[in-house]
Amino acid sequence: MNRKLTLWGLWIFSVSLFYLLCPPASAQTSPKREFRAVWIATVANIDWPSAKGLPTVRQQDEFINLLDFHRRTGMNAAIVQVRPATDAFYFSAQEMWSEWLTGKQGLMPEPYYDPLQFMIAETHRRGMEFHAWINPYRAQFEGDSLRVHPEHITRRKPEWFVTYGKSKVFNPGIPEVRQYITDIVADIVRRYDVDAIHFDDYFYPYQIQGQVFNDSATYRQYGKSFAKIDDWRRDNVNRLVEAISLQIRHIKPYVKFGISPFGVWRNRSQDPRGSATQGGQTCYDHLYADIRLWLEKGWIDYVAPQAYFSIEFDKVPYKTLVDWWADNSFGRHVYVGHAPYKIAPDGNDPHWAKPTQIPEQVRYNRRKNGKVHGSIYFSSKSLVRNPNGVADSLRTNFYKHTALLPLMPWKKGSPPPPPSGLEVLPSKKGALLRWNPPPKLTATENTAKYHAIYRVKANEPFDLNNPAQMIALTGTEGFFLDDTFPADGEYRYAVTALSRMHHESTAVYSHAIRLRAPGAWTDFVITLINTYRQAPKNGKKQ
């Protein structure tokens, strides 16, 4: 046992040493704009909450700790699963509270709070986007029918569902089903300040050998104009995606719509437009999700292909897959999905044991000449676990410098007015920045939503295009505590405002200031700020 522990300790030491000595080239070429996100899964309590039925304060503390960890790692967006299986992590008049939140389906949190409202506020406060992750078709997860509430939609509308394997899913061919799901999405967009609606890869279910998806009667009723049931199924999903896209744009045109499909659209052996891969199941042929069409039609704003394969995997090589998506995005954004959950010394693919696997994937993304716009990691707990030091590598190298999110030129927007009145007060806790945020504008998409903080030594010029000078993104509050500067010296700061769509204003600049130990007044101000941030508002914890 001691020998095993010693060998394990040596392995951990070797991995840590690798990242300490890793050349900083990637950090030096870090782009100013890059999407950096993490999936936070709630189904089966994969990432959050850590268990069913936790007290409200414990749930909130856990989520805040996750956000703080991922922001320190360099993330600028969180993709949180708010509807894992036709249930809700928010107040809904249509669907039940999730059992993975409260321990029992239909039971509200106690003490009461709205988790979605809380998560959005905390995410925005940290200068990060919040993408509401929804599973459109999954209704029951792996045979949990005994725990289903009597008022659950599967009990009220049993004719809408198909049992397949251990799960129950909506029948996509029924028009009322498509309308129901569209209404669910519209309700979230209308009532919550989400930055995006996000679907994952679950459309028609992954096929199980020897089992039939029993929708033949629905096909006979609604699919008469289609000679093949496969084409009809694809059309059903197309109709849903188009309807949701139109609904989002009608309610809040600035809200994005993104989808994270399985990595392979089609193999080239099936379609000359497909990738040079040998995927066992594909989006188009098995899940009936024609993601390439949705990009071509402009129905979605970004695609996040789940490229959960190593660079060396012969059947679906990572680089081959990324090349295909980069060349078939039709001008929309590509955020590549990475698989830190696969990192293990004894996994099925030995190449995942290499500490360089995900770092090399990120490097490759950045070499795609602007055709790949960022990365998403599945999932939160894998980054927190930090296998092979992957989170350390992101924090200290690839994401060492803060990044703004990429612009979407097809969406309306312009820079907000700049902030004003920037002051910097020294303190033993750091440098306290205070400024006046710009006024709100009539056009919501152009109102300041975030602020970017820049810092240089007093004798250096500002270059706001240099990501090394940007030290933080924060929310709309007009203050920031910088505790990252060297212990002594003179510095200057700049602050810009960013619109909801991340258009950046001109900057307001500070005078040079020598950072020394503070006076009692500055520490008092910092204490007041911290108290303000933690205080209940309107009698409820935010």
Locations of the language-model features?
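Substrate-binding cleft of secreted/luminal carbohydrate-active enzymes
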Residues: 288-292, 296-314, 330-410
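Aromatic- and acidic-residue-enriched segments that line the glycan-binding/catalytic groove
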Residues: 88-103, 138-164, 201-224, 269-280
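Active-site neighborhood of glycoside hydrolase catalytic domains
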Residues: 176, 180-184, 190-199, 203-277, ...
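Active-site-adjacent "subsite" loops/lids of carbohydrate-active enzymes
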Residues: 41-61, 132, 137-191, 285-289
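Pro/Thr/Ser/Gly-rich low-complexity, intrinsically disordered linker/stalk tracts
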Residues: 389-390, 394-445, 502-533
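Catalytic domains of carbohydrate-active enzymes, especially glycoside hydrolases
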Residues: 61-87
